[in-house]
């Protein structure tokens, strides 16, 4: 039986066509991105294809023809989340636009370390960590775990022992993790739904087993490494400022800066003739860059920002993937670099999984 909507000029107008599965699957992403403005149609279509591709068995079984409800606005006011690295970050982003990411990657990552220090370290931790960095040590931020992406399967575990913790470490794919330095290591702790983070100082880090992992990226600038071993850490070396979700807040704070850097790098590659941007790709790049800029300039943090930023990283990932698989990127090294950044600070599957888990179907 056909349905019709209103009468127009004496003739019934067909009802709007029902959404297909790809469009329905994309709603947990699109609803979050719409807070930044109207999406270009090409980007929306790209994200619909990606969402359908990323449906796992459980998601597909649970999928219905019902649309997802738009997320409700938070009843809590955003919290100020100011740090002292904004001006430096903006300066480096301008240099990336002119010269590409490779020559500015290390100083850009150092601003991330300073953001983490200023937002989530106690005053005593901050003073000691800054002194450590100022004396020539670099920070290794170790999140990816040999046990996989799910916290419950992590092999890196912090076990209470005496008046501190025994930290059993099995981390993979850490930037420069094979080199000496200090580290912030994310670990599973018994009974917690969030990972905990611990400061590991240079003399402790030097005792761990470290190995190279794969070829370097970004013109030899980025080398990954794996880390294993055990260290004892004091209670004072556990990150507590910011609450149990401190790591989530940190990633939500720095991800938009990373997305801005990636979009600036895409623009630079285009200027160098190493990447082609058609009208749809240009519109998608501009939307993502503008959205990321808007997020970095708010200076606040709200619970819903976690999902807004995950959607932004998802969009960035899918644009980079699209550029590579469509043949728009000329060189193998550039292709590999861009795909690597789709895995950094949130893969598409991880972003989509969390966005979908937070979404709810419309109730009849």
Segments from the language model and where they lie:
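Flexible, small-/acidic-enriched active-site or ligand-binding loops
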Residues: 203-237
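Glycine-rich phosphate/cofactor-binding loops in nucleotide/flavin-utilizing enzymes
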Residues: 2-14, 19, 23, 320-364
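A gly/ser-rich beta-alpha-beta helix-loop segment of oxidoreductase catalytic cores
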Residues: 138-159
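A glycine-rich, basic-preceded beta-loop-alpha segment at the flavin cofactor/substrate interface
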Residues: 225-260, 267-280, 291-296
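Amphipathic, small/basic residue-rich leader segments at the start of a protein or domain
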Residues: 1-108, 277-280, 295-303, 361-364
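A short, Trp-centered hydrophobic/proline-enriched beta-strand micro-motif
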Residues: 60-63, 113, 133-145
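C-terminal hydrophobic structural anchor segments
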Residues: 293-329
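A short core secondary-structure module
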Residues: 170-207
């Amino acid at each position: 039986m056909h349905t019709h909507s209103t009468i127009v000029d004496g003739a019934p107008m067909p009802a709007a066509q029902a959404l297909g599965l790809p469009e329905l699957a994309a709603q947990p992403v699109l609803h979050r991105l719409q807070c930044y403005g109207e999406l270009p149609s090409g980007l929306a279509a790209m994200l619909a294809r990606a969402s359908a591709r990323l449906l796992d068995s459980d998601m597909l079984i649970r999928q219905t023809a019902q649309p997802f409800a738009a997320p409700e606005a938070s009843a809590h006011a955003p919290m100020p989340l100011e740090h002292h690295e904004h001006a430096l970050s903006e300066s480096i982003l301008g240099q990336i636009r002119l010269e590409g990411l490779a020559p500015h990657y290390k100083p850009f990552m150092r601003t991330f370390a300073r953001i983490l220090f200023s937002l989530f370290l106690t005053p005593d931790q901050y003073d000691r960590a800054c002194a450590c960095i100022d004396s020539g040590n670099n920070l290794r931020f170790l999140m990816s775990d040999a046990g996989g992406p799910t916290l419950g399967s992590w092999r890196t575990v912090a076990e209470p022992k005496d008046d501190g913790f025994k930290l059993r470490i099995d981390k993979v794919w850490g930037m420069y993790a094979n080199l000496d330095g200090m580290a912030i290591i994310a670990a599973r702790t018994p009974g917690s739904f969030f990972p905990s983070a611990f400061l590991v100082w240079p003399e402790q880090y030097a005792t761990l087993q470290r190995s190279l992992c794969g070829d370097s990226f970004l013109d030899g600038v980025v080398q990954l490494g794996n880390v294993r071993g055990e260290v004892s850490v004091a209670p004072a070396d556990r990150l507590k400022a910011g609450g149990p979700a401190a790591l989530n807040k940190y990633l939500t704070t720095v991800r938009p800066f990373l997305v801005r850097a990636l979009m600036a790098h895409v623009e630079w590659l285009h200027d160098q003739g190493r990447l082609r941007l058609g009208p749809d790709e240009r519109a998608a790049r501009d939307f993502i860059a503008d959205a990321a800029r808007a997020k970095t300039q708010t200076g606040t943090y709200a619970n819903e920002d976690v999902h807004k930023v995950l959607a932004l990283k998802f969009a960035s990932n899918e644009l980079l993937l699209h550029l590579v698989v469509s043949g728009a990127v000329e060189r193998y090294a550039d292709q590999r670099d861009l795909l690597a950044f789709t895995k950094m600070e949130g893969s598409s599957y991880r972003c989509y999984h969390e966005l979908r888990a937070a979404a709810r179907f419309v109730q009849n």
